[in-house]
Amino acid sequence: MEKLEKLYEGKAKQLYATDDPEVLWVEYKNTATAGDGEKKEDFTGKGRLNNLITTIIFDLLKKRGIDSHLIKRVNDTGQLVRKVNMFPLEIVLRNVAAGHFCSRLGVEEGLPLKEPVLEYFLKNDDLHDPFVNDDDLVALDVCTREDLAEIAPLARKINEALIEIFAKIDVKLVDFKIEMGRATDGTLLLADEITPDSCRLWDQKDHSGKVEHLDKDLFRRGLGSIIPAYEEIEERLAELAKSEGIEVAE
């Protein structure tokens, strides 16, 4: 598969065409950003780790009946994915109060939620990705009621699977954001990535109750380098994947 012209560059990834019109090449960058890109720093090895982590998680989800756009990882920072028509949405699932949820609703970080909260944010840099509801999305022709009737249950199914996956490696899944799109045959697919960039992950190994971040909050809050945390997540996920018979790159 040949990598051709660059189609798009975001904060954390680059997207390239290939010699197959139905396949795209994703390159993971070493850049970390926070605060709508105002805080920015490169971390050597971040792109490699996020490529590995996304590949492992998508493979674990596939074993649990959840399909994604992933075809395969091709090198340290690259992967091949199916071309999908993306919804311009960040789909957020929250299991524990943290981040924007706390500041918006005045609740304490770490509060366990009685049930998972599903939220939508419109992908728009100029508007800082505003919070929107179902009616907003339909009124603005972002998606249809029928789309949402598929998106919501799939998002909740992904949440249940990820809670189980991360619990097996002694990590609490606090919240995460995902994206979805439709393949050319109309199938709704999980797309983009699932990494410590897009999840809040709290280590549970010492059982002390103290919050130890294994995610990008380390960078957002100036708590230290993200690389050791990302390496820890990759190593634990790799061991789990191997135990389930999934081939993992060394």
Curated annotation (Swiss-Prot):
Pfam families found in the cross-reference section: SAICAR_synt
Keyword terms, alphabetized: ATP-binding, Ligase, Nucleotide-binding, Purine biosynthesis
Protein name per UniProt: Phosphoribosylaminoimidazole-succinocarboxamide synthase
Catalytic activity, reaction form: 5-amino-1-(5-phospho-D-ribosyl)imidazole-4-carboxylate + L-aspartate + ATP = (2S)-2-[5-amino-1-(5-phospho-beta-D-ribosyl)imidazole-4-carboxamido]succinate + ADP + phosphate + 2 H(+)
EC primary class: ligase
Gene that this sequence comes from: purC
Any GO MF annotation of the entry: ATP binding
CDD domains hit by this protein: SAICAR_synt_PurC
InterPro entries the record matches: SAICAR_synt/ADE2_N, SAICAR_synt_PurC, SAICAR_synth, SAICAR_synthetase
Family from the record: Belongs to the SAICAR synthetase family.
Residues in coiled coil: none
GO biological process, one term: 'de novo' IMP biosynthetic process
EC number: 6.3.2.6
Pathway the protein acts in: Purine metabolism; IMP biosynthesis via de novo pathway; 5-amino-1-(5-phospho-D-ribosyl)imidazole-4-carboxamide from 5-amino-1-(5-phospho-D-ribosyl)imidazole-4-carboxylate: step 1/2
